[in-house]
Amino acid sequence: MYENDKRIVLTLDAGGTNFVFSAIRGNLQIVSPVCMPSCSDNLDRCLATLVAGFDAVIKSLDTPPVAISFAFPGPADYKNGVIGGNLPNFPSFRQGVALGPFLQHHYGIPVYIENDGNLFAYGEALSGALPMVNRELEAMGHNRKYKNLLGITLGTGFGAGVVIDNRLLTGDNGCGGDVWLMRNKKYPSMLAEESVSIRAVKRVYRELSGVQDADLTPKDIYEIAEGIKEGDKKAAIASFQELGEMAGSAIASALNIVDGLVVIGGGLAGASHYILPALVNELRATLSMFSGEQFPCLQMEVYNWEDEMDRKKFLDYQHREVLIPGTSIKLPYNNTKRIAVMCSREGASCSIMRGAYAYALSQLEV
């Protein structure tokens, strides 16, 4: 969607250390990104940097932009473009800053701000995983199409976004799709994010290996798991597997509401061959009744798209046919419920960029 659109949207990768400014047209980045220090501890300098960065991008364009759209860390009132609250990486915003209205007043074009989980999911739903799966199904001769998607980002935190039939679920308070504060399977009094994040991987590796090296990064732990670096290989693998299990528990709860495909991105997704099997296994878990009867925790069969055999099973299913009573008319009967879990093909940054572009254009059309 929007691949052939000629409108230009300015966008921003808002990090606590640097801002990276760019412009998108037809789902593609059309300028060399402009990188500037974010000056996040000084509001006046930070706002001046935002203006300078967008000005630099605008000067390189042959057509004026129609909007500005980007992800920015919360807490925030995204609908009204106000950023405020406990933002560790943007301390100067804690009292509340009308960032969207500030930029809109300065440039005279609409400004749309969302969280990265939402824009990741939106990008994957419109231009990534969702259309890819539907193309694969069509190629196999199936007329079924998926319309719903749960996007998950694994990194500093446990991010998520939900798209229902091409519409982003933001909720009445801008909290739609959040999973980070779901109950933690292993530590029920804690947030799920405490076991699904960079800090979780580091903590679990320390606990299992007994190595109290605060400088170890998830990349180091991954390389230990791969045998590239010395260390406790079993503990390294287990640290990613535990993250997958804990993420799966929270995702299962979300899927009972969303019922759609799951796509995973973010910095930790590089360890997906350790994370996904544990995650999918958790989605296939069972729950019991007092009578002893067992039920799957999800009504849908779950397939790991990254596993070749699983992917073939997901794509290779046959509809049954049933007769309308009293007639010879046959109708297709879809007696199987199934979803797939996969990794982002383009990566989180690209999907967030495309999500920001699509979100701006969709809002302009409202």
Predicted regions and their residues:
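Short glycine-rich, Thr/Ser-proximal phosphate-binding strand/loop in the N-terminal lobe
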Residues: 2-52, 56-63, 82-86, 173-188
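Short glycine-aspartate micro-motif
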Residues: 9-13, 65-69, 149-153, 263
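Short beta-strand scaffold segments in enzyme catalytic cores
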Residues: 19-24, 151-153, 158-163
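Adenine-nucleotide phosphate-binding core of ATP-dependent small-molecule kinases
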Residues: 35, 39-66, 188, 202-275, ...
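Glycine-rich phosphate-binding loop and adjoining helix at the ATP-binding site
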Residues: 39, 44, 48, 64, ...
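Glycine-rich phosphate-binding loop plus the immediately following alpha-helix
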Residues: 113-117, 129, 171-219, 361-365
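Glycine-rich phosphate-binding/hydrolytic loop that grips phosphoryl groups
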Residues: 114-127, 274, 281-366
